[in-house]
Amino acid sequence: MGARGTGGVPPTRAAGAAEFRIDLVRTQGQFILDGQRFDVENNNWLVGNDEEVLVIDAAHEAGPIIEAIDDRRVVAIVCTHGHNDHINAALDVHGFVGRVPIALHDDDRMLWNQIYVARGPDLPLKDGQTFEVGGATLGVFHTPGHSPGGVCLYLESEGVLFSGDTLFKGGPGATGRSFSDFPTIIDSIRTKLLTLPPEAVVHPGHGDSTTIGEEAPHLEEWIARGH
């Protein structure tokens, strides 16, 4: 069963005519790659206000995500990368909300195709791309390493980064499987994420939230540790 929570989400604020908010929906399932299966709990983030919302990842169970969407207009379903545990509810959510784009970076299309053969994503994500929702703007950072097409989304007005599986509390995402590379993820984190303000809150695709300031001092430790 999915669960809703705040996960350290900042307080809501007024944005235009409706109150801006960030919702967290946790869902459970399996991550499957290279013939292995792992039980996981995913963070699905919904960003917007009472009128419209952007869905960041749609994992495992569409029902709790749809419940959190409620009657809001969905701007897009953005997949931070193509691993099954971040996209396997995307089509079911899409089927409920109607004609909205499912967005994924082209470099992760081969991962998408492992799950969905007959239908591709609608919108290719690109570095520097932006999404407007609830009076706020989210910018896309291409952060390869965990997968070739991994992305993060930065909500600058709130000082919030949605990091997918690129950065977690305690270090970078795993790079010991197909299509991943440790030096690449370190470069992504160093050049794209650790340059953000130290107070920026990091909401990852799994586990607890953190801040850039909490993680930045440990970069050399991560490099020494390796993947």
Model-derived features: positions:
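Short polar/charged helix/loop
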Residues: 4, 9, 109-114, 182, ...
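An N-terminally biased module of ancient metal coordination in phosphate/nucleic-acid-related enzymes
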Residues: 7-8, 13, 70, 79
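Short acidic-hydrophobic surface loop/beta-edge motif
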Residues: 15, 25-27, 47, 127-133
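Conserved beta-strand hairpin/beta-sheet module of binuclear metal-dependent hydrolase folds
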Residues: 19-72, 152-164
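Active-site HxH/HxHxD metal-binding segment of metal-dependent hydrolases
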Residues: 39-40, 53, 60-137, 217-225
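Divalent metal-coordination and catalytic microenvironments
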Residues: 47, 57, 81, 93, ...
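Metallo-beta-lactamase
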Residues: 53, 139, 148-227
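Active-site neighborhood of phospho(di)ester-bond hydrolases with catalytic His/Asp-centered motifs
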Residues: 55-57, 75-83, 102-105, 142-145, ...
